Amino acid sequence: MVVAKIEKTGTLSTEQLQKMHAYWRAANYLSVGQIYLMDNPLLREPLKLEHVKPRLLGHWGTTPGLNFIYVHLNRVIQDEDLDMIYIAGPGHGGPGLVANTYLEGTYSEYYPNISEDAEGMKRLFKQFSFPGGIPSHVAPETPGSIHEGGELGYAVSHAYGAVFDNPDLIVACVVGDGEAETGPLATSWHSNKFLNPVRDGAVLPILHLNGYKIANPTVLARISHEELEKLFEGYGYKPYFVEGSEYEPTHQLMAATLDTCIAEIKAIQHEARTGGATARPRWPMIVLRTPKGWTGPKEVDGKKTEDFWRSHQVPFSEMAGKPEHVQLLETWMRSYQPEELFDENGTFLGELKALAPKGHRRMGDNPHANGGILLKDLKMPDFRSYAVDVAKPGTTFAEATKVMGIFLRDVMKANLDQRNFRIVGPDETASNRWGPLFEITNRTWMDAIHPYDDHLSQDGRVMEILSEHTCQGWLEGYLLTGRHGFFSCYEAFIHLVDSMFNQHAKWLKTTRHIPWRRPIASLNYLLTSHVWRQDHNGFSHQDPGFIDHVVNKRAEVIRVYLPPDANTLLSVTDHCLRSRHYVNVVVAGKQPALQYLDMDAAIKHCTKGIGIWDWASNDQGVEPDVVMACCGDIPTLETLAAVDILRQNFPDLKIRVINVVNLMKLQPESEHPHGLSDKDFDSIFTPDKPVVFAFHGYPWLIHRLTYRRNNHNNIHVRGYKEEGTTTTPFDMVVMNDLDRFNLADDVIDRVPRLRYTAAHVKQMLHDKLIEHKQYIHEHGDDMPEIRDWCWPY
């Protein structure tokens, strides 16, 4: 058993102890003031109801613990000259982080109107959770934050992502005991198996056991000390326990424990960096057990409050109906003795402010928490040199994501010295055809490596763990601290991080409008092994709905690309890696597929995002009878095959073929910056001709994006309609009416002059579908005429 026990408890001198306790009191005072007050910030007159906000919003319970940790981290940063940032997993303790950045001076530097005096304090208090003010959590508006902590579960993965390739950085990561019950958090403890002390920084997890969630005890606070200790030893940590409710001994124990943990981190790093990493180290962590709502009211209306769930939010909430609560609030706030903490102007006393680090060592002003400041452009090879040779459209085959993998291999190679590019994925890098990366780097692995293992090493730059949540959290932490990356995933299973994507998109949207927040590298997804080529794994693996989810977010931060072949995928990939402050979703196939555009045509097509394919159309100089649009690699294939059928049977039918790479082009320009104007949309799609649209995903998404268009009523969309099983590739499109025969049938139904004259052709199309079913049931594969089809014109 690992024994982690602190014997020494006299780390702080009497003067240090008194000053640190005073600093903590000041942070607690400011935190309570933010929740309750909009006037009389220093209680220079008796507190009255009109000084109190009419709507009381915020969370007190976790806040004193967050403040306690912050003041102790300040001391160790000063003593050891540490480069450290703070992640508050319980981000609902927002008043505490705002209070601490105000006390250290950072907040007023970022927001000069919140000055370091009584008037500034009044504004600080009033703005919190107030219309026109700031949110209640550790939101992007909070200096020093890379993690809002609104949706719980991601603190630890964000912390590790931040320290990868940041050898001097330490992230103090506070994990709430409620958050510790979430699935993503439980898995993310394993991130220590991927941390290389030679090249990476360190995470100091601080599990804050205050015992309660909103209305229930927490699991980890109620299990025995021995079981809790063994749990974290099993995770590979060396847990130190700091437990108490009495101020002086808890301060002393926390100080001694932090000194020990920092010393152990430095020793681990020194040994690895001088002798090389050999075995995975056992990193220290702290388990801090203090009362929920510490220093707050013991009881409210005769009911237990401190050290109980009732302190979670606002202990005194009925101020207007219970005047005695106003008096009790005043008593509570005066218990912090603000007259001993702030001078006559309302400025924090200099001797106390001196406890905070200076300049960029302040956790609120650390550049790593505003990663765009540190962001360096990737060194990019010329993607055009990776082009697939396409002498004639629709006649040669290539694996699009394998070509992309070759390009990413050389992006990785070009940036090895900068150490600012990583790949993440849930054990799918090779499956998704990014195997060429392993010619340059390996998978990160800090545990035992056997001779027969495949591409594992301690200095690998491909991060694989079978947890989409952890992959997403690592990448977000990496990007938020000023680096670049790509996440490849099976299309159906990216849904596991739907809500994580939500939170990151909200962060990007908000920070776009905060002047001091610098743009960061985009979060790039490759979604492959997609719905139309999951015929082998079956229905559970077939879901293209992530893009529906993505387009719900603000247009200013999301982009969705569906390149139809390898050269368009190369162009899109280059664009995504150069872009800033977006979420880019790229959907592409990994199987051998027909190639349509040479590199010059691909660049032009991707730059426009949507376009008429002249080589596939025959309406030059005249109005088309029908528009056939496609978006996605398989819909493109089936559309072109349908065009072939129609041209063979109706040589005089004028067909316009449109391909969409940038899905957001379909929206009006008033809704998305990439959207087409109505004039341009009508020019391409016509204002009145029938449109048969073959789409990669759920068909109603196209209707959502185009419902304001003049010709919307004539747009008929085919896509995935939740039909699937383990079958052949072509049968997948047949089951969803997206196949070439059904698309040709749709055209016949919608072109008036064909409706009643093409009955024989319609019957032939139906016969082909019957023939298809008979063939696959007998042979277990698609008909040769389907498998081997190429563009014949």
Curated annotation (Swiss-Prot):
Lineage per the UniProt record: Bacteria, Bacillati, Cyanobacteriota, Cyanophyceae, Gloeobacterales
PANTHER family for this protein: PHOSPHOKETOLASE-RELATED
Annotated protein name in UniProt: Probable phosphoketolase
Listed cofactors: thiamine diphosphate
Record-linked Pfam families: XFP, XFP_C, XFP_N
Organism for this UniProt entry: Gloeobacter violaceus (strain ATCC 29082 / PCC 7421)
GO molecular function (one): aldehyde-lyase activity
Disulfide bonds: none
Top EC category: lyase
EC number: 4.1.2.-
The entry's keywords: Lyase, Thiamine pyrophosphate
Signal peptide: none
SUPFAM superfamilies linked: Thiamin diphosphate-binding fold (THDP-binding)
Swiss-Prot/TrEMBL GO biological process terms: carbohydrate metabolic process
Family that this chain belongs to: Belongs to the XFP family.
InterPro entries: Phosphoketolase, THDP-binding, Transketo_C/PFOR_II, Xul5P/Fru6P_PKetolase, Xul5P/Fru6P_PKetolase_C, Xul5P/Fru6P_PKetolase_CS, Xul5P/Fru6P_PKetolase_N, Xul5P/Fru6P_PKetolase_ThDP_BS
